[in-house]
Regions:
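An N-terminal assembly and electron-transfer interface module characteristic of large anaerobic redox
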Residues: 2-184
Length: 184
């Protein structure tokens, strides 16, 4: 059972510490999501019929072709273009049946994770439960609802108080409450 999420594993000692456990649990958990990690960790990803342990085929092969190839030694895509593609892909994959739906869920999981707010992490867990909860956890699928990732501005102001925590202009900053200083 369970849904396992693995991120940011690059250092060899860390990989070695969990690699055997991931391999043992991979085929016995509801889903194993590995993202932004070393290739030897990424290969453990299994979400429905989508796995990363084999040669790309179907939707993944198509996505690699769409990505393009480097020209004149320049990178194929800047970080900004890659993020734009990451946001666009789930909208495209929504209309392709089969394994593409699991690939879509993988890219949505990346979006939730990269946005990194409490709300997005809760939405990510809801999505994964709705899609992959099995066995005694299958009843949770009826409760969990897929909600799109909350998108935040690339550049913004973080504020602890206020309706929105991240705003992209000074107009969205909450007015401070009137406080008078005290002495002693």
């Amino acid at each position: 059972g369970d849904i396992i999420i693995v991120t940011m594993l690059f250092m060899e000692p860390h990989i070695n510490a969990v690699s055997d456990a991931l391999a043992a649990r991979r085929d016995h958990c509801d889903a194993l999501v590995c993202c932004m990690s070393a290739p030897e960790v990424m290969q453990y990803t299994r979400m429905g019929r989508f796995t990363m342990d084999s040669e790309p085929s179907g939707p993944i092969a198509l996505l690699k072709r769409l990505r393009g190839t480097p020209k004149d030694g320049k990178p194929a895509a800047t970080g900004e273009r890659q993020l734009a593609m990451l946001r666009r892909l789930p909208r495209i994959l929504r209309f392709i049946p089969g394994t593409a739906q699991d690939v879509r869920t993988y890219f949505l999981t990346l979006q939730y994770w990269l946005a990194g707010s409490e709300d997005n992490l809760a939405r990510m867990v809801n999505l994964l439960v709705q899609r992959y909860a099995a066995g005694p956890r299958a009843v949770l699928r009826q409760i969990a609802r897929e909600q799109p990732p909350i998108e935040y501005p690339d550049v913004g102001i973080y504020q602890m108080e206020g309706r929105q925590r991240i705003v992209d202009s000074a107009d969205g900053i909450a007015e401070p409450e009137e406080h008078s200083g005290t002495v002693g």
